[in-house]
Amino acid sequence: MARITVEDALKVAGNRFALVLLAVQRSKQLLRGARPLTNVRNNREIVAALREIADNKVYFSHPEYLMGAKEDFKLIADDTTEFIGDEDYVE
């Protein structure tokens, strides 16, 4: 997927969390047989959804729900934390 498509869609969606929600929802609609709103040229559904978002053809019906979504995040693990799959299994 083209980076420019994601960056353009991000400008329209407002933040990356809203973009993910909107892109997934539209991708599912396309997978179920919805008619694409842009020329998809054999692109996968997620790319078509991002292009539609970037072209302002797809948007949230209730954008006020996203007003509380923040871009702030923090890491929940430090360098000493083990990750799932790192442990040795003993039988």
Swiss-Prot record:
Top EC class, one word: transferase
Gene Ontology cellular-component terms listed: DNA-directed RNA polymerase complex
GO molecular function per UniProt: DNA binding; DNA-directed RNA polymerase activity
GO BP terms in the entry: DNA-templated transcription
InterPro entries linked to this entry: DNA-dir_RNA_pol_omega, Pol_omega/Rpo6/RPB6, RPB6/omega-like_sf
Transmembrane segments: none
Catalysis: reaction(s): RNA(n) + a ribonucleoside 5'-triphosphate = RNA(n+1) + diphosphate
Entry keyword set: DNA-directed RNA polymerase, Nucleotidyltransferase, Transcription, Transferase
SMART domains the record matches: RNA_pol_Rpb6 (SM01409)
UniProt entry tagged with the keyword Transmembrane helix: no
Protein task: Promotes RNA polymerase assembly. Latches the N- and C-terminal regions of the beta' subunit thereby facilitating its interaction with the beta and alpha subunits.
PANTHER family named among the record's database cross-references: DNA-DIRECTED RNA POLYMERASE SUBUNIT OMEGA
Subunit structure: The RNAP catalytic core consists of 2 alpha, 1 beta, 1 beta' and 1 omega subunit. When a sigma factor is associated with the core the holoenzyme is formed, which can initiate transcription.
UniProt similarity note: Belongs to the RNA polymerase subunit omega family.
Protein's UniProt name: DNA-directed RNA polymerase subunit omega
Organism lineage string: Bacteria, Pseudomonadati, Thermodesulfobacteriota, Syntrophia, Syntrophales
